[in-house]
Amino acid sequence: MRIFLDTANIEHIRHGVRLGVVTGVTTNPSLVSREGKVDYQKVVKEICSVVHGPVSTEVLGEDVQTMVAEAREIAKWAENIVVKIPASLEGVEATSVLASENIKVNLTLCFTLNQALLGAAAGATFVSPFVGRLDDIGEDGMKVVTDIVEYLDYYQLPTQVIAASIRHPQHCSTAAKIGAHIATVPYEVLLQMIRHPLTDIGIGRFRDDWKRVMGERGILS
């Protein structure tokens, strides 16, 4: 399973890339605005220059014509752009139009297998079930991800699943176990995935044992 960052923070993206684990980004106008940015296109282009994998960014339009027009323009910003289209009736139709033009689509705000099924049929490159938001209303977000993965696998469809609205590391590990192709995570969750108190304790013990014998001398000293 690949890891994407769900953010518009350039420094967080740079750090994820330096770690060697982040291979894509998902973002939207809300995430860009949280960073105090006003030039949406400039921010997205900068992200695309930092990450060489897919960068999903969202349209604002709600009708088919506007979504398609915005998507065509956004797709020109960089070669690794993927356009996020909402899983609405209009969004599915827009996805079909864009897929016929070889514009990659991430069907976002997906909450059911049926939405993902239609998105895949329309030619979406990715579908993004929102795990945390489903959990928030008492539904089982990971069950929806499981159903979508099983459906796509059974029919050998090329559409990939991005587990989105990830709230904690357990969401990510569960997504990996059930076969999601990608999990897009907030920067804070990425850091939580790496950290464990027993790792910190072990590092401290190794350091203390070394100092007892070798003092302050390092391995390369």
How would you name each of these model-derived features?
Residues 11-19, 66-70, 94, 112-122, ...:
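Catalytic cores of alpha/beta
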Residues 29-32, 109, 125-137, 179-199:
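Glycine-rich phosphate-binding active-site loops on the catalytic face of alpha/beta enzymes
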Residues 28, 83, 119, 175, ...:
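Conserved, mostly hydrophobic/aromatic
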Residues 109-144, 151:
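Histidine/lysine/aspartate-rich catalytic loop segments that bind and position anionic ligands
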Residues 41-55, 92-105, 141-161, 205-220:
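Alpha-helix-loop-beta-strand connector modules within alpha/beta enzyme cores
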